[in-house]
Amino acid sequence: MIAAATPAPPAAIGIVVRDLTLRLNNRVLFDKLNFTLDGGQCAALLGASGVGKTSLLKIIAGLTPADADTVSGSDGLPLAGRIAYMGQKDLLYPWLTVKQNITLGARLRREKAESDWADYLLAEVGLDGVGACLPAALSGGMRQRAALARTLYERQPVVLMDEPFSALDTLTRAKIQALSARLLSAHTVMLITHDPLEACRLSHRLWVLAGQPARFLTGLDLAGEPPRAPDDPAVQQSQGALLRQLLGSAE
């Protein structure tokens, strides 16, 4: 029954940002920023704290107002209603079961929860059998897996991730990185991270945001598909190049 509930992956759409300008507290954060992320690709977004990474994700998500037609999908249509978001904190409601947390979006929209789909995702993230548990019974890594399942439950083609694994221990983080790369392979993903190795393991493109107003430095493209092995020579080489770019942007 669970396998039958597995839907086709969402149709890949890219992210297009044109002439984005944003002023916050008399500071020009972005001035005519332009970029495109192809559908089905993952871009890692890095840069110093306060440079505007989270502000950019909030604009794309529609949480911070922007001028009309500044942000769109590669199909020319608005991205509203086609985005899922995953942050650093799992934001699980402690009084709801794990499964109820995963299906919360449907309930808030007054839709019937898709129980089989939720069960399938719980199994995919290694939480089979804990759907009836409260979040307090889960470890930090298990809670973040539940948050990943909740993100996937929405079946949105674009996923925005703001340091989703930074609070986890090294071993748990490596496992969930690999899991998320596999489960999000059909989605368009923008990932904020401060970890060069994580960026090189999980993304197709590396973008460093720097300056005031903020702009993208020369991007780095990575060969092959995520997740990449941490000891892959190409990953190590890309990590070194990325770190040099980050250090240069801080001077």
Task: List each model region and its residues.
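A short, proline-enriched helix->beta-strand linker immediately N-terminal to the Walker B motif
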Residues: 153-157
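Hydrophobic anchor residue at the start of the ABC signature
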Residues: 148-149
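Conserved ABC ATPase signature
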Residues: 134-138, 142
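Conserved ABC ATPase "signature" region
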Residues: 113-130
